[in-house]
Amino acid sequence: MALRLLKLAATSASARVVAAGAQRVRGVHSSVQCKLRYGMWHFLLGDKASKRLTERSRVITVDGNICTGKGKLAKEIAEKLGFKHFPEAGIHYPDSTTGDGKPLAADYNGNCSLEKFYDDPRSNDGNSYRLQSWLYSSRLLQYSDALEHLLTTGQGVVLERSIFSDFVFLEAMYNQGFIRKQCVDHYNEVKSVTICDYLPPHLVIYIDVPVPEVQRRIQKKGDPHEMKITSAYLQDIENAYKKTFLPEMSEKCEVLQYSAREAQDSKKAVEDIEYLKFDKGPWLKQDNRTLYHLRLLVQDKFEVLNYTSIPIFLPEVTIGAHQTDRVLHQFRELPGRKYSPGYNTEVGDKWIWLK
């Protein structure tokens, strides 16, 4: 079985079918940020990024291991700075941001399960890599939504993790023997042709919580699936953060690190942010022209996801054409998923002929 986020139609349906190899799926995701498409004439007539971007127009990501308090800190920072908070993108991110907001069946969401990964990370049906591949695509969509919001409104954004830190889970999975080397190669190929078009965050905040404390928090939380996570897996995640992610990001953006105790004080974090100079990274080299092209990219979800589908056969994420067509047909039969919002009579849309 395989996962792929493919072809986007002009609908705002949140489906993205399990597919791979030759699979292309319509009716996936449309932006919730801006209904009127931005284009060349807007730019020529004066709608340029420099008119709305200010020193508060920042992209901040909050990173850390599992159960380190990322969500709480990210939300509080966003509230104090007046930024928009983007909770961590999960399997159902497309469902939560489009359509009626309700989660769809696994067939329309990568045919993967986080709970199954925790219960049986070495499952021979390929669930572990399907999950990781799907989550990368979900983070890619979310990051494009966040950048679109920033460029459209000028309001800063705060995310929990991003496409730039997603690889830490891949490395941990591989080190623990959950996925094959071919899966790592496939992931890196997809990442290399997708992430290159995106600017990194202005700031990365890393919450450093020791593995024993992470495990204690997981046990206290009481999720029966998460409680099966091994200390070795958590340690590999931490190692990937500290040995690869943080050194790489420190060359591209500002980095702040906090202990578990320090992360409880969001007021102090905001003060630290306001003292930063933000004097490094590719954002400094951008002008109206480059930001215009970036905005065109992030509003086009077809283009955002286009290169997540590459012609490489990988059993974990590949299904046949007949199954792809079957799942797509089933999706189009769901209430409100056949046409664009406002044009589906089966969900009560009226006066369609006047629209």
UniProtKB/Swiss-Prot annotation:
Q: How is the cofactor bound?
A: Binds 1 FAD per subunit.
Residues recorded with modification N6-succinyllysine = 285
Q: Where is the transit peptide?
A: 1-35
Q: Tell me which Gene3D superfamilies the record gives.
A: P-loop containing nucleotide triphosphate hydrolases
- What's noted about post-translational modification? Phosphorylation at Ser-250 by PINK1 is required for the binding and/or reduction of the complex I substrate ubiquinone.
What's one GO-annotated cellular component?
cytoplasm
Q: Which residues form a coiled coil?
A: none
Q: Which cofactor does it need?
A: FAD
Can the keyword Transcription regulation be found in this entry's annotation?
no
Keyword Chloroplast applies: no
Where Phosphoserine occurs along the chain?
250
Assembly with partners or alone = Complex I is composed of 45 different subunits. This a component of the hydrophobic protein fraction.
The text of the family note is: Belongs to the complex I NDUFA10 subunit family.
Name of the molecule in the record: NADH dehydrogenase [ubiquinone] 1 alpha subcomplex subunit 10, mitochondrial
User: Which source organism?
Assistant: Pan troglodytes
Q: Which gene encodes it?
A: NDUFA10
